[in-house]
Amino acid sequence: MSQEKDVRLEDVAESKAELDDKARKMLEDKDADSRMRIYEGPLGKAIIVLLCVWTAFQLYFTTIGAISAINLRAIHCIFLLLFTFLLFPTYKKEKRRRKLPPIWDWVFILGSIGSFTYLILNYTRIAQTGGRISDMEVGIALVAIVCVFEAARRASGNLAILAAVFLAYNWFGAYLPGYFGHNGFTLKRVLITQFWGTQGVLGTGIGVSATYIFLFVVFGAFLKHSGFSKFINDFSLTLVGRTSGGPAKVAVIASGLMGMINGSAIANVATTGTITIPLMKRTGYKKEFAGAVEAVASTGGQFTPPIMGAVGFVMAEFLNLSYTYVALASITPALLYYVGLLLAVHFEAKRLGLSGIAKENIPNAMVVIKEQGHLVLPLVSLIGLMFVGFTPLYAAVISIFVTIGASWLRKDTRMGPDKILGAVVEGSKSAISVGVCCVIIGIIIGTVTLTSMGLNMGYLILSIVQGDHIYLAGFLVMIMSAILGMGVPGVAAYVIVQAVAVPVLIKAGALPLIAHLFCLIYACLSNITPPVAMSAYVASGIADSDQTKTGLWAVRLGLIGFIIPFFFLDNPVLLIGVDKTATLWESLWSIFTAMIGTFALVAGLEGWIIRKAGVIERVILIAVSPLLLFPGSLTDIAGIAGIAAVCIFQWIRRK
C-alpha cells in the first residue's frame, strides 16, 4: 500500500516532550548515568567545582604535566570512586534530590580515598621489595577492592557480577579439571596482583580511562554544547530527507555520526531516538522497525572512524600502532555496516511505498553550511593534528579549545561561560560510569593474567577446532565476545573481550590488528544482540514496540555487521593498509565488490531491488552475496552474474 504524503516535522513535535520523558525512564532502568543524585545547597556547588578540578587535572597531566603512570591512575581512581559514591544512588528507587549522601557513602568515600592515597605514598617501596606486603596492607587492599565492587555495582550492575565470578575463579579454579583449572592462589597473592600491581585495578583498563576515554568524552560534550549535533541533524536532512523513507536515512546518518563521538550507543538512542523514531513511525515504518533502525545506527558509531567512540585510540595503544593505521583498517567494516543499513531502510521504504519529509521542512544545504559549517572545525583539527604527528591526547585537548574558538565564529553558536561549564560538568559526569567499568575490568584482566585464562581458552578452542580452522575459532570467539560485551559500554566491552578472546584468534592464525577489530565489532554488536540488546530495548521503549521483535529486527538490520568480520578474518585485503602484499587498487576493488555483495544480501533479505522480489530471486541474491564478500576474481564474476540475472529478470517483468 503506497503512502505518498510527505511527513511534516511539526506533526511529531508535540509528542517529543512525552517521548523525552519515556526515554529518560528507559534510561533510568538501563543506564545508571540517568539516575544520578541531584544535590541542593552547598554540596551541589562543591561537586561542580570538584568536577572542574578533575577535568583540569586530567587535561594538564595527560599532556604537559609530569606525573608517573601509577599516580595518574590512582588519582583518577580516587576521583571516580568519590563521584560514584556522591552521585550514584545505592538502589534504583532511591530519591534523587537530596542535601547530603547517606552515612554509608561517606564510609565508602573515606575507604576509597584512604586506600588509594596509601598506595600512592607507598607504591615505590612495595615495588622495590618485590611486592611483599604486610597484614595491614592486605587489609587496605581488601578495603579498596570492596569499594571498587560497590562502585561498579552502582554504575554498571552486570559487570560487577561478572567481575565477582572472575575474582572467585582465582580460588575455585583450583578445583576445576582440564583447561579451566589452575593451581590456586593465596589471598595475598591475589591482592598483590589486583591492587598492588599494574595488572589489576590500576592496570590497562584504568589507564585507558585516565587518558583516552576521559579526554574524548569531554571533547564530545564540548561538541554537543557547541551545537554540533544540530548541524549533523540538519545536514543529514539536506542529504537524504526528501528521498523515499527519508526519516530513517536521517536517523542512520545522524545517529551514526553522534554515536561515533559519544561512544555510548544507549545514551545516543535516548538522545536522537526521541526525534527520529516518531518521524519514522509517522512516515509509515512499523514501530519495531523504527526502533531497530535507531538502535543499529547508534551502535555502529562505536567502530566508525575517525573517532570510533575513543575505542580506536585504545586499540592503537594495545597494538602499539599508529592510530591512523587502526582508523584506515576500520573504514571497510563501518562502510559496509552503514551501506547495508541504508539499503535496508531504502528497500523497506520502496516496498511500503513510503515518501520523504515535506520540502518545507528540509533546510537549505548552503544555509546549513554557511551558518553551522564552522562547527566541523574541531573534527578537522583533531584529524589534522594526528595526521601531522600529534598524539591523540594532545590532539583532543587542542581540539577542545578549537571547539570553543570555532563556536565564536557566529553569534548564535558562541560558547560562553555557562555553556563551557555545562560541557565540563556533562563530560566529566559521563566519564564516571565508563571509568568505573574500566576499574572493575582490571579485576577481570588481573584474573586472566594471573591464572593464564586467556592462553588456556586459546588452547581449549584450538583443541575443539582441531587444526587451522580459523573460521570455527572465530565463531566461538564471536559468541564469547557477545556474551562478555552484553550490557557494557563499548570501550569497556572491548577491553574485556580483547583480554580473553584476542589470544585465541592470534593462535588460530589471525593478524593481531584483525583479531582486535574482530573482537571490537562483536563486543559493540552485543548492544543489539538478544537477550540483553540494551540499545534495542531502549529504542523499543521510545517506539512503544515489542522488545523482542525490536531486538530481532535489529539483528536483521545489522546482519552485515555480524557477517563481515568473518570475511576479513583471513582476508586482510578487505582492510585498507593491513595486507602489505596487496596494492591499493586490489583493496579498493575488494571493498567495491563487498559493497555489491552487501547490496545483494540486503536486497534478498528485504525482498526488493527494482520491484518486489520473488522467492527464487531472493534465494539467488542471498546465495551469491558471500561470493562477492570473499575476495577473488572468479567469485566476483559469479556473484555479479547472479545479481545481473536477477536485475534483468526484474526489468523484464516490470515491462
Which role does the model predict for each range below?
Residues 1-131, 137-145:
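Conserved, well-structured core domains of diverse proteins
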Residues 73-78, 207-217, 325-340, 391-400, ...:
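Alpha-helical transmembrane segments
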Residues 233-301, 307, 311-314, 320, ...:
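Hydrophobic transmembrane alpha-helices that form the pore/transport pathway of multi-pass ion
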Residues 373-513, 521-522, 602, 611, ...:
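Long hydrophobic segments that form regular secondary structure
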Residues 135-139, 200-212, 238-252, 283-289, ...:
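Membrane-interfacial loop-to-helix junctions in multi-pass transporters
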Residues 220-224, 255-264, 296-302, 442-445, ...:
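Transmembrane alpha-helix interface/packing and boundary motifs in multi-pass membrane proteins
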Residues 2-45, 328-430, 534-626, 654:
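Long, contiguous bundles of hydrophobic transmembrane helices that form the permeation core
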Residues 149-155, 165-166, 170-173, 179, ...:
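Core transmembrane alpha-helical segments of multi-pass membrane transporters/permeases
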